[in-house]
Amino acid sequence: HRDLHVRSRRQRQMCIRDSLGAVDSQMSKVKKELDDHDVVFQPGLNEDLAATALWGSQQAELRGEGLFDGVFGLWYGKGPGVDRSGDVMKHANMAGSSTYGGVVMAMGDDHTGESSTVLHQSDFAMIDASIPILSPAGVQEIIDYGLYGWALSRFSGLWVGLKVMKDTVEATSVVDGNIDRVSFSSPPYVKPEGGLNIRLVDQPVDQEERLVDYKIEAARSFAKENNIDKCVWKGGQNPKIGFVAAGKNWLDLVHSLSLLGIDEKDSERLGITTYKVGQIWPLDTLSFESWADTLDLIVVVEEKRKILEGQIKEYLFDNSKGRRVYGGKKQGVELFSSKFALDPVEIAEKIGYILEEEGCGSDKLLSNLYYVVNSRKAENTSEIASRIPYFCSGCPHNSSTKIPEGSRAYAGIGCHYMAQWMDRDTLGYTHMGGEGANWIGEAPFSSTGHVFQNIGDGTYNHSGIQAIRAAVSSDVNVTYKILFNDAVAMTGGQGNDGGLDASRVVAELNAIGVKKVVVVYDEKEDVNFDLFNPSVETYERSELQNVQKKIRNEKGVSAIVYIQTCAAEKRRRRKRGKFPDPDKRVFINTDVCEGCGDCGVQSNCVSIIPVQTELGRKRAIDQSSCNKDFSCVKGFCPSFVTVEGAKIKSKAFGEILLPELPDPVLPKIHGTYNIIITGVGGTGVVTIGAVLAMAAHIDNKGAGMMEMAGLAQKGGAVHIHCRLADNPEDISAIRVATGEADAIIGGDLVVTSGSKTISLMKESRTQAIVNSHEIVTGEFTRDTDFFIPNDRLKLSLEARLKDAVSFFDATDLAKLTLGDSIYSNMIIFGSAWQKGMIPLSYKSIKKAIELNGASTELNLKAFEVGRWAILFPIEAEKVYKSRVTELPKNLQERIKFRETHLKEYQSDRLAKRYIDFVSRFSGTFLEDAVAEGYHKVLAYKDEYEVARLHTNTISKLREEFDGELKITYHLAPPVLSKLGNDGRPIKKEYGYFM
């Protein structure tokens, strides 16, 4: 929701934003340059207010007060923002754009619902407001069509929609940024008296007349004059079959024809012509008729609800030539579905059969069609394991979304939406800004007397306060839990518009009549309570459950403002030195740990990981991902210690003594070379894609890269599609199709072995290198027995690729050589390059890593470690297994280990007692269970045993950390500890003297 004003005849540009990813953060980085060029980048707060501000920008010169001849503006927002802006869109479009201004609305559509609560198609909202729609195919056309859109807006007096989708707007591509590469001319169109642009004094009836009688036709005329729609393949002298598509579907169509082996020369022979539409509404029907004149069959390739097909059929309805039009249906049977989205393989299958029916079924086409049909079967591969998004390590929502037993809660828009799959009695949500208003309608008819409603500070600021006011007016019993995490976390961690802070939220809630407002805060953060009214009740976050139990009994609307900074934003700020970084780390002594999982229950933290020991599965802290929230320490377990002065230990890079590494034979590119990068959100996967694309640019190759993540930045699955070509024009759709992957850089075994990735692989074509480390999923926080079936996942990849897949533990290798698992993806990348899987030069990759600018030296080292690891796998294995405990290989070794353990625990006599008892069951099916169970009975961990086991804590710490270590034990001795309000013993801190 921001708005944009640039200069032409002393024009100014204004940009008002909605949350279209990182546009605003990028704009903020170049604020000086924008200011120098009269570009105003301005918060819009929410989408409809942003659009209203742009409406105002078109009026700047109407009263003779304008500082510039005109202002041209850009609004950008996702589909939900388009929907909520419908009223202002109609008003502003009826009023019109200014003569030297113009407005473009970039609408981010999510056809597949990967990062939205509904599957969005905004086209019909635009059409309903009579706003023309441009549909760019690729990054270059976003620039070109944006410029065209402003020119069209000025000429026609209409606002103009620019449809952007994941395949275009979330893609990386090499483009020509010179705006002089495109130019536009005005058609000889006769306008009414007074023109088509905005007027100071105007009447609704007159506005409608201009819109219906002139403006829409002016848009068609402008499209024809500037050839926005183009015939790409002419199809010879007398083409009979024509394919029509626009935007993302145009890229899909080009790709699908390639899959069928049809090139432009074949199209001439077969009489196939293609038509690329740029302005999808209103369609330039005169240009279309000229193209379609000789055709017998027109196939409209279009996903979702049909826009082009309807216009084409309406135009051809009275046509006597009898041309057939296939689109959503073919002779009454579904062809291109209105559900979900289309992909090149699906399109290739459908049009392949059509061409065969139309007599174009050459041996080559039929052979390729057979392959396409069979490759689609791979998409039905069953999932062995999956990785869903989850709260980050140390995320405030880990604590804030917990509710007392007997209560229930609603989710909403934001990261807390994920609480719905975390067993937190949280189900149901609304659109942004409606949080809690659903309860107004449900409450009178429900036996439930009270609910909690989660809402983030970004949503509150955007529109959520209106829902709270509505709840106050209705006097329903609801407690709003407002997380103030100081960041709009879902869209990149931006700050709240208008400088909103927690004290203002509390003051506003009191002012609108919320009956009780309390503040719960993270005691580790420096909250300035001088800004709050002294009467406000404040509690540390450990009291949250008790606060909720009390407040749910309040009548009417109440609120808890929960203050804790977003974990991802904390991490970013700490790297920049702008947030306190406690000199403290959490460590679990695995000898003391019993693997009960209560630490995961208390913290819901994905930095708690499993570790196999001789005595079973225990817990450990992943120091690389830990965000120092320390909630895990509350687990009812004496194994936790915190340590100050600790620096993560890693072997110095030189200790590996890398030999001089030979250069690999790089693969040749035939058409395109397709690379898939997989991994876990937040672990640097996107960085690898960015480096690849930049290296290709440095090597003078074409490159297209697209991130397919959705909520994956929150710990879910990430897929990066990267296509390389010797010539940029050889790249159509960036999304790699089924069976088309040449190389897989597998940063995570779960994601790489998933059906979405495996379907892209083809034996004899695809090579893969995969990180074999068990990167746990969020499921482990709730299920103590959860494990990732690594062996089965590896087998599934080997079944598909045979010997063309390699595995090694890049995570542990990164930790032990570079001190942080974040470099594991770069290590896998280095291995893939050394194995001859990446058609880019070493020099270009090195330069791309340097240009990326993030931890340059360590990333370069990681790349070299990866090269070394694939050439010297035995030596690499010795490194990454150096801290792995050698487990007993059979039952007799397990019994022997437990015998030794009992001697250390107490005495030889106790050990003999154990052996004597177990021997009674030797050779029976009970022997294994008795050997483990009886040992647990004898080696009971009382206070004395815990103390004995903690005597080796310092040596265990020395294995993982360097520095002058100051240890604190976190214990709840039965005699000394008190019970908290939640009935759990309160842990106390004890120094090393213990």
Give, region by region, the residue ranges found by the protein language model.
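Single conserved hydrophobic/aromatic residue that forms the stacking wall/gate
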Residues: H1-R12, I16
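Thiamine diphosphate
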Residues: L20-R154, M165, T401-K402, R408-M490, ...
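Active-site cofactor/cluster-binding pocket
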Residues: V82-R84, L500-S503, E508, K516, ...
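Conformationally flexible catalytic loops at phosphate/diphosphate-handling active centers
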Residues: S156-G235
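Iron-sulfur cluster-binding cysteine motifs and their immediate structural context
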Residues: Q564-T565, E569-R576, E594-K651
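Small-residue-enriched alpha-helical segments and adjacent helix-cap loops
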Residues: E893-M994
